[in-house]
Amino acid sequence: MQKKLVVLYFLVLLAFAGLSARLVLINRDNGEQYKRQVLSQQQYSSRTLPFKRGEILDSKGTKLAVSEKVYNLVLDCKLMNEKEEYVEGTIAALTQCFDVSESDIRSYNEQNPTSQYHVLQRQLTYDEIAPFQELQNNEEQGKYIQGVWFEEEYRRVYPNNTMAADVVGFTSKDNVGNYGLEEYYNDILSGINGREYGYMNDDSNLERTTKAAVDGYNLVTTLDANIQGIVERKLQEYNDTYKNAAREGNGAQNVGCIIMDVNNGDILAMASYPFFNLN
């Protein structure tokens, strides 16, 4: 009996050895092929994390230029088309909450059924997207709303509209300074985008890696918003008073004014007329 157990033990051991050898050979000869098959069954998740451009402030902290978070409304047709009820539920929710055309969405979906990125609206505020998010989170309606997500970005806003417009300058749509301080100090005000990425399998197991965005630095000027406001108001009053007096048009074609602190050379106000709205 003992001899039979010993023989059985060695047979099992040989079987495991043979199986191990077979696995080694499979990995050597077909490892890359199986690796590609596994990766093909996974979903790659990647998104950009936008940096926040630095603020421009006067000497007392009054904000002359800021960046506010906004959201792009993005449609993933491939995900929405997984079930017919998803298509109807999603389109109904979109047309209920946003100024989008049902016919345009259906037309795009028919022509691009596998599209995973289509921007329906840009630069929406949080208040504008909140009603839709409520529908998404609703236990009954939410399960039929699929393939819609919000892409975050920042929009440049100038709280005082025309104040120090020639000095502050403005940015282009891609968040790059194009004029004034925005352009001159663009490298300081700009940051570096981050990224979040990872692989997701069918069980929604995701090994996620996040590289955080680096925000831009704030820029503090020597301007005094109170003095700046007084200067601009006086320039406006002058031009309103003498408009169409000596000739047709403004009191002056162009007017400029600079207020300097004689003790240290700080520029407290710098204005020119006509004004323009930075927003």
Predicted regions and their residues:
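Periplasmic/cell-envelope proteins involved in peptidoglycan metabolism and beta-lactam response
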Residues: 1-279
